[in-house]
């Protein structure tokens, strides 16, 4: 049960992609051929209205010096004209106004009839307003959440179609900012004004504010990728790289002798390390909680040594300071409460703290252009269609259906920004889009972290290459878990024909064609240790 979309791109990728949905439940895939970067492309999907995209990015956005950036968007069934900015710095706060005009009401709004943006833009806290808005700096590779929340309630209707909300951030030094608005898209190049002159509405918003539990300072974006064969995954953070190797691929049960399949996985890890000029490498073995502590500790240490020895044979490690250790069952990645989780905990973890950045940031498939080199993509377990055409998914044996259309993918520095339109099928949906678009093997984040704040998040949409699955970029929040740079609260039901806008940011795969995929659930009973 996998759905898949494909999209051709150069500087901008507009949605003429291919989407493949697996039959009865959400997994799927999509891909396609996009226009030349110098052209503009109209995009739209069932029930989504229309939007436009230019080579400069900012789909449907307009704005100039000192002006806000305007987009016409589809948000939980409603068609809205949203103007973001200009942002105004006043003392210790930067106020980002969001002026919204209701063009057409849908029937999916959490406050029908009409539309209440404060119920969609308010983030995961207990506030009403625009607490869920975030700032993205693609050049610096950072994201910033609000640090204060203004409790603003808005009810838009035909009689009163206009309102203004305010997102409150710590001030930034930049002249312009990129503003990610929940289920409304990315607003790029919003001007920042430093004269401290706030509107009367902004002053009123600042009269009743609360400090949030968000991450108010800019925090580095990280990448999380997994090998298509499930043998490894990689986390790239600001100062370290962590490669997790699945012990079930490297070793037989209760053994520290490398298997015949281990070299393929270890060679990929060696190639990753070889892109760095040097640094400190620690190799640590981990087990599940089957068998006693002493046995698991010894096994984990011997496995770490085996991996270290073989890596030294596969690549020149002289530029690295290498250490090995074992933790047994003491530091599980996820709770040892299921066979699937125990499998995740059986691993050898390679942590690199490099002396400087990698010599190449390209993906293993970057030189392949179309993304079809270096092997074939995994077989889709459902239909395949162009991203602009969309794929309709049915959940289980129910009549609950949703159509997903990949409307645009744009390169921004070393990132890809994608927009997906989700539209309710006949009879509408029983759950919001996020419930369809979460990892099917892991609870919480794509990394396997448990976080109740991600129950409504879009965490499972990945870009697929023959070798690697690229999950949405993410960042560490105050609680210590990772939140994706995608929708966090896309949990509103969609009635028939109503659509909403989902924005997802991935690391650049370095290819001319991207494949959007949602992996299927896998049921296995792996061996212990």
Model-derived features: where do they sit?
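C-terminal motif of bacterial Sec signal peptides marking the signal peptidase cleavage site
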Residues: 21-23
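Surface-exposed edge beta-strand/loop patches
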Residues: 27, 67-69, 155-220, 354, ...
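The feature marks short-to-medium sequence segments in extracytoplasmic or secretory-pathway proteins
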Residues: 103-158, 268, 272, 412, ...
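Periplasmic peptidoglycan-binding/anchoring modules of Gram-negative envelope and division proteins
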Residues: 227-239, 250-284, 308, 312-313, ...
């Amino acid at each position: 049960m996998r759905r898949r979309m494909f999209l051709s791109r150069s500087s901008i990728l507009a949605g003429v992609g291919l989407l493949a949905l697996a039959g009865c439940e959400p997994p799927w895939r999509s891909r396609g051929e996009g226009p030349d970067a110098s052209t503009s492309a109209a995009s739209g999907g069932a029930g989504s209205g229309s939007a436009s995209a230019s080579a400069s990015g900012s789909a449907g956005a307009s704005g100039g010096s000192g002006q806000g950036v305007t987009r016409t968007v589809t948000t939980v069934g409603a068609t809205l004209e949203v103007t973001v900015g200009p942002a105004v710095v006043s003392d210790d706060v930067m106020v980002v106004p969001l002026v919204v005009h209701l063009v057409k009401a849908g029937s999916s709004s959490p406050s029908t009839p009409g539309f209440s943006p404060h119920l969609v833009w308010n983030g995961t806290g207990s506030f009403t307003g625009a607490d869920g808005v975030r700032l993205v700096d693609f050049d610096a590779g950072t994201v910033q959440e609000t640090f204060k929340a203004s409790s603003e309630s808005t009810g838009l209707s035909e009689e009163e179609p206009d309102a203004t909300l305010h997102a409150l951030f710590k001030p930034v030094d930049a002249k312009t900012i990129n503003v990610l608005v929940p289920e409304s898209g990315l607003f790029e190049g919003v001007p920042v004004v430093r004269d401290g002159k706030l509107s009367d509405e902004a002053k009123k918003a600042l009269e009743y504010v609360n400090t949030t539990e968000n991450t108010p300072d800019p925090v580095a974006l990280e990448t999380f990728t997994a090998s298509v064969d499930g043998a490894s995954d990689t986390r790239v953070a600001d100062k370290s790289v962590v490669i997790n190797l699945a012990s079930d691929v490297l070793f037989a049960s209760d053994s520290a002798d490398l298997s015949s399949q281990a070299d393929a996985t270890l060679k990929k890890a060696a190639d990753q390390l070889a892109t760095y000029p040097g640094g400190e490498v620690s190799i640590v073995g981990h087990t599940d909680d089957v068998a006693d502590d002493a046995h698991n500790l010894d096994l984990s240490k011997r496995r770490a040594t085996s991996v270290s020895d073989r890596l030294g044979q596969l690549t020149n490690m002289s530029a690295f300071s290498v250490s090995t250790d074992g933790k047994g069952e003491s530091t599980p990645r996820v709770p040892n409460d299921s066979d699937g989780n125990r499998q995740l905990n059986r691993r050898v973890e390679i942590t690199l703290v490099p002396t400087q950045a990698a010599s190449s940031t390209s993906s293993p498939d970057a030189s392949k252009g179309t993304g079809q080199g270096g092997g074939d993509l995994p077989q889709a377990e459902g239909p395949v269609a162009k991203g602009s055409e969309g794929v309709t998914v049915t959940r289980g044996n129910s009549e609950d259906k949703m159509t997903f259309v990949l409307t645009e993918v744009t390169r921004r520095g070393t990132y890809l920004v994608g927009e997906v339109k989700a539209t309710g099928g006949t009879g509408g949906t029983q759950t919001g889009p996020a419930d369809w678009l979460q990892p099917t093997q892991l609870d919480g984040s794509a990394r396997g972290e448990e976080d109740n704040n991600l129950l409504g998040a879009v965490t499972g949409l990945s870009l697929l290459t023959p070798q690697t699955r690229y999950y949405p970029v993410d960042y560490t929040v105050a609680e210590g878990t990772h939140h994706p740079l995608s929708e966090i609260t896309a949990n509103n039901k969609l009635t028939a024909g109503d659509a909403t806008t989902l924005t997802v940011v991935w690391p650049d795969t370095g290819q001319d064609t991207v494949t959007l995929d949602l992996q299927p659930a896998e049921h296995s009973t792996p061996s212990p240790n």
